[in-house]
Amino acid sequence: MQRIQLAEDLQFSRVIHGLWRLNEWNYSDAELLSLIEWCIDHGITTFDHADIYGGYTCEKLFGNALALSPGLRENIELVTKCGIVLESPERPAHRSHHYNTSKSHILASVEQSLMNLRTDYIDMLLIHRPDPLMDPEGVAEAFQALKCSGKVRYFGVSNFKDHQYRMLESYLPEKLVTNQIELSAYELENMLDGTLNLCQEKRIPPMAWSPLAGGKVFTENTDKDRRVRTALESVQGEIGAASLDEVMYAWLYTHPAGIMPIVGSGKRERISAAINALSYKLDQDQWFRIFTAVQGYDIP
């Protein structure tokens, strides 16, 4: 498994396991532990969480499984996010869906995540979404307090556009080390609007959520779906990939930004597709055939 350097003493596995839908997998603690161990055995050591996943339940489910084998903690990297507030039975005091990136909320969210995940520290904390009411000085104070206490090692953001990223980072004593963005061989917005360019400018490898675009290309039948599917099938035959999943992952891996896809499945065979795709590299012709199919028109 390739390793991606994010900071001097922090590496992530190229493939990241996402726990967004963990509560829907209906795994026992022992079954989830088995999946975590399988991931580690196959080189996947980075696990992506958020406080709100599963209506505030997924972190706790993961922590319960990890508690069965506490020694595994030193072999993995934990990512979590905060800043979104949801109405939920798990949070009866919440009255509406809104953002909260205040210093007090960030600190309280991290304390809860540490308890949920059964750990003393988080490797990476991300601000989940840009907050139009964000006080960047308060965020900086929260990050500094968490860093000094050893509760969070590094910080990043999620879904930030380039101007939002630059604004927040300008207040921080240390640079952000990733931006988790939607990116796939189906959704190109962040590749075309400067967001991915900023990651390259800053030398920060991005994390990519929804790298298979939620499966739309496999299940829907719009003009775009048919175009992209045809291009993927053409490249699949040329490189000998076992599935269209593998082609979509290989398309991301071919980009020089060091994109780390987040695989949000509890099925080993679906996770394996992201691993297997590391053995493929598309040439320019193959990569641009897919790119052009997604856009729906030829490049200039």
Curated annotation (Swiss-Prot):
<dbReference type="InterPro" id="IPR023210">
    <property type="entry name" value="NADP_OxRdtase_dom"/>
</dbReference>
<comment type="similarity">
    <text>Belongs to the aldo/keto reductase family. Aldo/keto reductase 2 subfamily.</text>
</comment>
<dbReference type="InterPro" id="IPR050523">
    <property type="entry name" value="AKR_Detox_Biosynth"/>
</dbReference>
<feature type="binding site">
    <location>
        <begin position="210"/>
        <end position="220"/>
    </location>
    <ligand>
        <name>NADP(+)</name>
    </ligand>
</feature>
<keyword id="KW-0521">NADP</keyword>
<dbReference type="GO" id="GO:0005829">
    <property type="term" value="C:cytosol"/>
</dbReference>
<dbReference type="InterPro" id="IPR020471">
    <property type="entry name" value="AKR"/>
</dbReference>
<dbReference type="Pfam" id="PF00248">
    <property type="entry name" value="Aldo_ket_red"/>
</dbReference>
<dbReference type="InterPro" id="IPR036812">
    <property type="entry name" value="NADP_OxRdtase_dom_sf"/>
</dbReference>
<keyword id="KW-0560">Oxidoreductase</keyword>
<dbReference type="GO" id="GO:0016491">
    <property type="term" value="F:oxidoreductase activity"/>
</dbReference>
<protein>
    <recommendedName>
        <fullName>Uncharacterized oxidoreductase YcsN</fullName>
        <ecNumber>1.-.-.-</ecNumber>
    </recommendedName>
</protein>
<feature type="active site" description="Proton donor">
    <location>
        <position position="53"/>
    </location>
</feature>
